[in-house]
From Swiss-Prot:
Cellular component terms (Gene Ontology): endoplasmic reticulum; endoplasmic reticulum membrane
Name listed for the protein in its UniProt record: Translocon-associated protein subunit gamma
BP GO annotations: SRP-dependent cotranslational protein targeting to membrane
Signal peptide span: none
InterPro entries xref list: SSR3 (IPR009779)
Pfam families: TRAP-gamma
UniProt function note: TRAP proteins are part of a complex whose function is to bind calcium to the ER membrane and thereby regulate the retention of ER resident proteins.
Membrane topology listed for this record: Multi-pass membrane protein
Residue numbers on the Cytoplasmic membrane side: 46-51, 142-145
């Protein structure tokens, strides 16, 4: 019975809260809107004429980036938690048998670790996405017509970012 409880706690630990999903989606929407400004300012693609394309591709990229944020968040949180487990064990040996204090300290440490993992996930994925979009749009697909350049560059940038987030090397 204890094993079942342990596994269910692990399963629920990997669930993403609604707040996190909202934060991820808002951040991914903001980052996916950056190329809209670039294409409007640099390539003179009118926002009024291409509103449907901008909106649909940006929404697609935001959804894909949301999954990438979650993947990196999980890996970063596990790595940070594992590295900080040694710190909490060492501090328990020094403090003694103050179980309430240790439990509160562990809870605060888990919350801080979670926030740090969210921040690292957002920074990493934003950088990868913007670098991919820049390389695709300005170097690889520079001779493709602008509308197709935008669609391909943003979609591939988001897809590649999501693909790279599934790697176990983080």
């Amino acid at each position: 019975m204890a094993e079942v409880d342990e596994f269910s706690a692990f399963r629920h630990e990997n669930d993403v809260s609604i707040e996190q999903r909202i934060v991820y989606f808002i951040n991914s929407l903001i980052v996916a809107l950056v190329p809209v400004y670039l294409y409007h300012a640099i390539f003179f693609m009118s926002i009024d004429d291409h509103m449907i394309i901008y909106g649909s591709v940006t929404l697609f990229a935001a959804i894909v980036l949301t999954f990438a944020y979650n993947n990196i968040y999980r890996m970063k949180r596990l790595k940070l938690s594992a590295s900080r487990e040694h710190i909490s064990i060492a501090s328990k040996n020094k403090v003694g048998d103050k179980k309430k204090f240790a439990a509160a300290q562990k809870e605060v440490q888990a919350l801080v670790t979670s926030h740090e993992a969210i921040a690292a996930s957002i920074m990493y994925n934003n950088a990868v996405f913007l670098i991919c979009v820049s390389i695709f749009s300005f170097i690889i697909f520079k001779n493709v017509p602008l509308v197709y350049n935008y669609i391909i560059s943003i979609s591939l940038g988001a897809g590649l970012t999501s693909f790279l987030s599934t790697s176990s090397k983080h």
